[in-house]
Amino acid sequence: METVPPAVDLVLGASACCLACVFTNPLEVVKTRLQLQGELQKRGTYPRLYRGFVASVVAVVRADGLCGLQKGLAAGLLYQGLMNGVRFYCYSLACQAGLSQQPGGTVVAGAVAGALGAFVGSPAYLVKTQLQAQTVAAMAVGHQHHHESLLGALETIWRQQGLAGLWRGVGGAVPRVMVGSAAQLATFASAKAWVQERQWLPEDSWLVALAGGMISSIAVVAVMTPFDVVSTRLYNQPVDGAGRGKLYGGLTDCLVKIWRQEGPLALYKGLGPVYLRLGPHTILSMLFWDELRKLAGWGQHQGS
């Protein structure tokens, strides 16, 4: 893999993930609706407005129009830029310091970088979740916040809940991205090396990065989905006058309530759309990042 300065990795990582976000945001809208459907209700006791991936896409388009599939895109792009810029910058610093050469170092570096990125990007993810949950009353699932735009949502939350309100739900976001980042970066590097060792593809081919991203995406979805469901619930729940969540007290409380009231399988709600969103996003992000790093490395060689 090409070596580039951490500051360059910040720009490349943010750019790669923003590019991927443009393609995968419709899947994020569907995933959010499915994860909020039947909140804290036993299976079979609530109307299923969204059923599976294709039917859910149709339901979103009927309720919100074709543009409804790109709800929350601005917030999503802001989140991807902030979170992944910080994440790839910190990961690059760790690799530069030699941590990735130590046993388990890639996992640790990926987890720490993911935690820092999740904290920085949390306000954008909060708004993204709330915007994507919004729809007409007949198709509404979860609490409806009635925001008009990204900036309007940030202003409303700031005015009503203060600075702390912008980071509400961060307790669920940090472990979510920690496990996802550790799985993604560790398995991508290992998968790429494994594919290259077998010489199935030319060593510098973009197909190597594509194969690595596909393998990595399976690991990411497997470990990240329960935390993804919890994060969606924490970010979208209504709050009281003191800014405290009305439904969940935090990560552990949310996990326990979902398990007890909806059953353990509810932690994998929307698994199909989750993979259809996180899978392509992981594949595209890692592919774009790897190819942009090659271009940056080539540019450095040409300039020297």
Curated annotation (Swiss-Prot):
GO CC annotation terms, alphabetical: mitochondrial inner membrane
**Bilayer-spanning residue ranges:** 7-27, 45-65, 98-120, 170-191, 206-226, 278-301
Return the Solcar repeat spans. 4-97, 101-194, 204-295
Q: Could you tell me which InterPro entries the record lists for this protein?
A: Mito_Carrier_Antiporter (IPR051508), Mitochondrial_sb/sol_carrier (IPR018108), Mt_carrier_dom_sf (IPR023395)
What UniProt keywords are attached to this protein's entry? Membrane, Mitochondrion, Mitochondrion inner membrane, Repeat, Transmembrane, Transmembrane helix, Transport
- Describe the reaction catalysed, as an equation: a dicarboxylate(in) + sulfate(out) = a dicarboxylate(out) + sulfate(in)
Q: Where found? A: Mitochondrion inner membrane
What biological process terms from GO does the record include? blastocyst hatching
Q: Which domain of life is it from?
A: Eukaryota
The UniProt similarity line reads: Belongs to the mitochondrial carrier (TC 2.A.29) family.
The function of this protein is:
Putative antiporter that exchanges dicarboxylates and sulfur oxoanions across the inner membrane of mitochondria.
- Name-wise, this protein is Solute carrier family 25 member 34
Q: What organism does the UniProt record list as the source?
A: Bos taurus
